[in-house]
Amino acid sequence: MLQALQKLLGDPNERKIRKYLPVVKLINSLEIEIASLSDAELRAKTTEFRQRLDRGESLDDLLPEAFAVVREAAKRVLNLRHYDVQLIGGMVLHEGQIAEMKTGEGKTLVATLPAYLNGLTGKGVHIVTVNGYLARRDSEWMGQVHRFLGLTVGLVQEGMSTDEKRRSYHCDITYCTNSELGFDYLRDNMATDIKEVMQRPFNYCIIDEVDSILIDEARTPLIISGQMARPSEKYLKAAQVARELIRDEHYEVDEKARNVILTDEGFEAAERLLGVSDLFDPKDPWAHFVFNAVKAKELFIRDVHYIVRNQEVVIVDEFTGRVLPGRRWSDGLHQAVEAKEGVPIQNESQTLATITYQNLFLLYPKLSGMTGTARTEEAEFSKTYNLEVTVIPTNRPIRRKDAPDLVYKTENAKWKAVAEEIAHMHAQGRPVLVGTTSVEKSERLSAMLKEMGIPHNLLNAKPENVEREAEIIAQAGRKGAVTIATNMAGRGTDIILGGNAEYMARLKLRERLMPKLVQLDPDNPLGSASTTSRGGGQGFGPASPKPKKSWTVVSPNFYPCELSARTSQALDEVVAAAVAKYGLNRLPELVVEDLIAVASEKAPVQDPLILQLREVYNSIKAEYEKVTEAEHEEVVRLGGLHVIGTERHESRRIDNQLRGRAGRQGDPGSSRFFLSLEDNLLKIFGGERVAKLMDMFRVDEDMPIEHPLLSSSLENAQRKVEVYYFDLRKQVFEYDEVMNNQRRAIYSERRRILEGENLKPKILDYMRKTVEEIVRAHVNPELPPEEWEIDKLTAKMQEFVPLLKENLKADDLRDLSYQEILDHLIKQAELAYEAKEAFLDTFEPGLMRKAERFFLLQQVDTLWREHLQQMEALREAVGLRGYGQRDPLIEYKNEGYELFLEMMDNIRRNTVYNLFVFTPQLVQVPQVAQAVPAQAVAASPETGGVVEADFAED
């Protein structure tokens, strides 16, 4: 029915694409005219466009000509010309949509079109990538187009100074990572001086791999935290208790919700083992520790969710299979896993500032993104982010054949069939990529292939395999290659049929340069300081130390040919030149990695050594390409890359990403998934239906099962998971929306304080409100005056404003009305404030203004931190109210709002009180000191030294 309707009305995506075709035609018609311009005339177009914007033309008016200018600039600078489909992609991005573009279709080049057009406004364009390497590569490579046309291009990287970042954020186009962008946003909202603020107001953002950031990472909060000590012995005892407790007797595991529930017997057993009467005793709480210990035991599996390296628990990204050094699970969970593994337990942290990617990117007035797979998540992009998905046609037709799934009764039978399929393809000479879902499963298959004598490469989160990522990917498309990869989806690298000559040339440079340039570890003179490789696997931390470090590729016959005598000599000469310039074994490993990366990219450079390195790199690449291109043709004839999936992922999108590794840029290829009724997806989400199917199919284990009921069960299971996780993300979004509204309010107020020249009117308003509160607490106008608490009121006012101790008497207020008392006390407080200001002016003119800003920021930051903890506790508490027929979200909104109002009142009261009670302390300092946030600094006229006015309270 749906297909018939689509046929009648036409595919909505096709209709969308058709509306862009007249604009593509117009851009193409301008090509000859724009090509005739000189470089200077082409560059002058930028000034012309900006003037036209000033005169009232819109970006849409400029689009055809601006796109034609970018296309011409890319031809001249990069020797790349935008295809028509790439122009459509650029228009989709400019309109604030998501462009789905298949692997190898040139997403990076597409982004130059809307980035240039929107960069003309001068309000800033952010191009966001998933790692620092890609951000730098794109800023240097694609940035050439923008620089050629006269736009400024910035790059934000981890470890840059505040000034460097500010300069980059103030460029027309800024390349950065999603995490650095988010952390800088939070840092800006913790700044104590407007000079520390790095970012401008957000304008337009293009996200590369948008599904990875807005869907997969949506529930991951960015957190800036401070250390908070927590007793490690509690984690260790809780881990011992968890080991004693028995599943299904003492606790139940909800794998779908990734949670554990203790039974009554479980509570009794835990209390008995710990020697306590109540796990929830507020004076000695144990419940949180025990729950986390049981979660660590049942739900967090070594070599699946984390690995242990150098006595540390390191998280493995479930989507990409990469390790995430530096990331920690929150809420004591990481400590529970550390206790389980018997490694040192690190301190918990207190949240100082936090935001989710969902709310960070919703701060942009215009947002767009690119990815190879977004259609399956179209509903979520639309509902959560108000983003439309448009599928961009490929430049060449897709030739990949996707075979139907083969489903086996048992897991053993499935793995046996996978191994046989690999052997069959390997015998034909076709390269094979096998996707697995965990380190453990990849090693199981590897062991089977070893027994069968099939050579293969293993790519998973284990340090020894991480090191070889570039080497493995470089040859994954070669004839007869077999590659087993854990969660290949997020690896962000193309598999090129016949082998990747660029990677191979880079590895040859690395093999020769690293042993000569990298500094030696004094404790390990045979090896380097670190065993980390970044040659294609950014984002990995240091691996376990090895007795000797070698950068030589492991695979025999890795390089497609021996280098010619001329190129070998040029390589020897450039290595000698590098040693002459930098010294023998003097550079950190990452510096040498960067040197090789810059030499092998296309970005413009001035350094003679890098230019020499680049020349040698290009010679090596050219020699390798002669062989790899011939092999490419042979592999194409054999049928291209064959992709094998060994389990359905929870998301169809991730399955599609794995399939998409085959058939890039019009190459042939094929894919097939091998599944079993014992796979996690079917076990957890297929439920009883699958159990019945298992009884129904009384067939031999080695026979694949094909049945409409089974296919629908699979699809239903996957859809259930997608809906389940969408609901989870939606729930996170709804709860975080409450926090987001509060965050926006407090950050806006904070920015006004930071930017405000004169905060005195705000402080006087705070003071009047606080005096009114004090009066209302002690004087009720509806009661007779003899019942008013005048003595208590006087004492409270004297406590609040110490300067009134001498002048304010209770007897002065007894015969006054409520309004007269209020007016009199406000007047007295104002006079006291003026007196305090005059007193401070004797130390330094304008010192009161500095004090106002200091105390306001101090109170906002301190009370916001406490508020974050209260909101976290509230969120945990309201979860239980669902059992009482009350909506937890509404309860969270209402009580969260009350907590927020209370925090704002406390900011007001505390700031005014601190301003009245603080006393400057004079400290003679022999020379100009560094500014300290808690101090105001003024020159001493007598000595020319510095007087520090410390904002100390009495």
From Swiss-Prot:
Its EC number is 7.4.2.8. GO terms for cellular component: cell envelope Sec protein transport complex; cytosol; plasma membrane-derived thylakoid membrane. It is found in: Cell inner membrane; Cellular thylakoid membrane; Cytoplasm. ATP binds at residues 86, 104-108, 494. Coiled coil: none annotated. Keywords: ATP-binding, Cell inner membrane, Cell membrane, Cytoplasm, Membrane, Nucleotide-binding, Protein transport, Thylakoid, Translocase, Translocation, Transport. GO terms for molecular function: ATP binding; protein-exporting ATPase activity. GO terms for biological process: intracellular protein transmembrane transport; protein import; protein targeting; protein transport by the Sec complex. Residues 520-549 are annotated as: Disordered. It is a peripheral membrane protein. It catalyses: ATP + H2O + cellular proteinSide 1 = ADP + phosphate + cellular proteinSide 2. InterPro entries: Helicase_ATP-bd (IPR014001), P-loop_NTPase (IPR027417), SecA (IPR000185), SecA_CS (IPR020937), SecA_DEAD (IPR011115), SecA_motor_DEAD (IPR014018), SecA_preprotein_X-link_dom (IPR011130), SecA_SF2_C (IPR044722). It is an enzyme of class 7 (translocase). Pfam families: P-loop_SecA, SecA_DEAD, SecA_PP_bind, SecA_SW. Part of the Sec protein translocase complex. Interacts with the SecYEG preprotein conducting channel. Has a central role in coupling the hydrolysis of ATP to the transfer of proteins into and across the cell membrane, serving as an ATP-driven molecular motor driving the stepwise translocation of polypeptide chains across the membrane. Probably participates in protein translocation into and across both the cytoplasmic and thylakoid membranes in cyanobacterial cells. PANTHER family: CHLOROPLAST PROTEIN-TRANSPORTING ATPASE (PTHR30612:SF0), SECA INNER MEMBRANE COMPONENT OF SEC PROTEIN SECRETION SYSTEM (PTHR30612). Belongs to the SecA family. Monomer and homodimer. Part of the essential Sec protein translocation apparatus which comprises SecA, SecYEG and auxiliary proteins SecDF. Other proteins may also be involved. This is Protein translocase subunit SecA. It comes from Synechococcus sp. (strain JA-3-3Ab).
